[in-house]
């Protein structure tokens, strides 16, 4: 028995009946020989971790276009926070951590430069609307490895595509990443805005702080624990109605108080000048020579 087969056996014996087992993967578009050591989702995680698009995340801003200081989030730090949150939930629910991690590490590969402002500009340039989740899938399927793609499993691509659509991922692991993404960006956008003195902790509505917590750490703890306690032993990933509604309201506060202030006026103004000029130049160049 190979090391991979031993790991797959342990998955069958220890993971939840609702987990996505490596041996039950729908496979890859181009069939490959199995690795002697790593199951399929672990191989996918490694491919994403070592691809060029993943390394480029470090220079893509999350919210602030030109942050002064090293402590503001980038797409890379956001991705790592999503992965950490998702793995914590998956481990507690005995779901497949390798699948969760692969989806989390790949979910934002298709995001634009210049944060949300860059996406705003590119959305106006494209013949069809630009969606970063679709671009993420395009990267792993067609652009990486000189056009060969990473040949990821169906489950990982499904989780990447549906982490931000009306459709839900087909696996519980994908649903975990979908919620973990929201948990991460809602909280760290507010944390960065407080650091940038755009708002203070006291600006957050009191009722939301009473429900979710009076600090970023407390809110993360509340949301993650709520998902675990409400999803354990079930074939879905859910939250309590009270906490879910509070998270929705906190997201609205985040958009209104953080995104619109940090990249709304300033971001769109820059999108009409420097950032727009850069995106226009790159778009025109690649459109002329695909």
Predicted features along the sequence, with ranges:
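Short alpha-helix carrying the canonical HExxH Zn2+-binding catalytic motif
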Residues: 101-106, 179
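Alpha-helical ligand/cofactor-binding cores
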Residues: 105, 119, 137
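A short acidic, glycine/proline-enriched capping/turn motif at secondary-structure boundaries
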Residues: 87-89, 108-111
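Short active-site segment of divalent metal-dependent hydrolases/proteases
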Residues: 110-114, 184
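Post-HEXXH active-site segment of zinc metalloproteases
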Residues: 98, 102, 115-130, 196-197
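Histidine-centered, transition-metal-coordinating active-site segments
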Residues: 1-79, 83-89, 96-97, 130-290
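Short glycine-enriched loops at secondary-structure junctions
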Residues: 54, 106-109
């Amino acid at each position: 028995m190979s090391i991979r087969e031993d790991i797959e056996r342990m998955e069958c014996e220890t993971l939840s009946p609702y987990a996505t087992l490596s041996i039950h993967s729908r496979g890859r578009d181009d069939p490959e020989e199995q690795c002697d050591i790593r199951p399929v989702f672990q191989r996918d995680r490694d491919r994403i971790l070592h691809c060029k698009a993943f390394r480029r995340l470090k220079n893509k801003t999350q919210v602030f276009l030109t942050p002064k200081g090293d402590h503001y989030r980038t797409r890379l730090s956001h991705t790592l926070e999503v992965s950490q949150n998702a793995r914590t939930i998956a481990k507690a629910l005995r779901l497949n951590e390798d699948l969760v991690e692969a989806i989390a590490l790949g979910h934002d590969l298709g995001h634009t430069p210049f944060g949300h402002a860059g996406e705003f500009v590119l959305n106006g340039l494209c013949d069809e609307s630009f969606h970063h989740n679709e671009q993420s899938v395009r990267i792993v399927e067609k652009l990486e490895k000189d056009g060969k793609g990473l040949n990821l499993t169906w489950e990982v691509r499904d989780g990447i595509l549906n982490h931000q659509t009306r459709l839900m991922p087909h696996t519980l692991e994908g649903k975990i990443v979908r919620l973990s993404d929201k948990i991460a960006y809602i909280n760290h956008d507010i944390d960065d805005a407080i650091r940038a003195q755009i708002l203070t902790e006291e600006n957050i509505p009191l009722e939301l702080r009473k429900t979710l917590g009076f600090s970023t750490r407390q809110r993360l703890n509340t949301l993650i624990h709520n998902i675990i306690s409400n999803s354990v032993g079930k074939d879905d990933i859910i939250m309590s109605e009270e906490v879910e509604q509070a998270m929705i309201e906190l997201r609205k506060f985040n958009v209104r108080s953080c995104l619109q202030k940090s990249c709304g006026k300033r971001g769109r103004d820059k999108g009409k000048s420097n950032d727009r000029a850069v995106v226009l130049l790159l778009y025109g160049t690649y459109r002329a020579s695909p």
